[in-house]
């Protein structure tokens, strides 16, 4: 039986939204369990630190620069049966912890659960958010060993590998992979998904919108110069691919090849757009994305193939289109 849920909140330099994130956890409705808040940040702030102390939160200061390093510290410091992750600029729906606790309680052996999002504005606070009614659980359990190629395709197309604030994990398992998390700094959402849905794993997808995703300028990149946007995304994508490959090699006996290959293909499609590949190479990747869409589904692969076709004729135009259609990163 689940007795305690730990919420790991990480923050790097940014102070603006942190207390909103913490308050969204403190004001959970009928969680039915003890809640532990673990904040890992790289700054000292009297107001924030005083609030965290008065709230009984575990407040960890670190000089660690990487996201993975902070996440790993939070995992190691947690004492709950389940760990939920939360970025400092996001918030939880008031019923999230209660539903997640119930899901883990009713489905023994789960390692990983992913829930959906509700988009909120930059100005939204924990007490002004118009939350959706998510009391009835919309949840499905999967056994990784029983999934076909097409089923894996559908799962990844549902964005189950997207966004750390949507992820919850069995705490003992999270602690067992903490060192791998520590060594990663990009696409931690995909790393957690890849590890949590490994061989013989039981995992779940929850369609309830339990995470409030704050959409602001630093995320969308719409107000940045196209060249700057391309350069930043190019660096991010290259590092993400490197992280994904390193994780696969480090945990090769426990990772499923299919989701790894599917995620890698999607990243390579992104890279082909950002890196101004020659036409021949772009065409080969475009064909691979299209074949995947035809065989296994996933509208994002169809979209990437169309953008890559456009990229053959105009890299700048394809990047402009890519930037404007991204609500969630592809």
Language-model region placement:
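N-proximal low-complexity "stem/linker" segments adjacent to membrane-targeting elements
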Residues: 1-24
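Glycine-rich, basic loop-to-helix element that forms the pyrophosphate-binding segment
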Residues: 62-78, 88
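C-terminal subregions of glycosyltransferases and related glycan-biosynthesis enzymes
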Residues: 1-2, 149, 153, 186, ...
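Conserved nucleotide-sugar donor-binding catalytic segment
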Residues: 139-226
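Flexible acidic/His/Gly-enriched loops in nucleotide-sugar-dependent glycosyltransferase catalytic domains
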Residues: 64-69, 98-173
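Short, acidic, metal-binding catalytic loop of nucleotide-sugar glycosyltransferases
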Residues: 23-34
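A conserved acidic beta->alpha catalytic loop
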Residues: 39-50, 87
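Short aromatic/hydrophobic "clamp" motif used to bind/position activated sugar donors
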Residues: 83
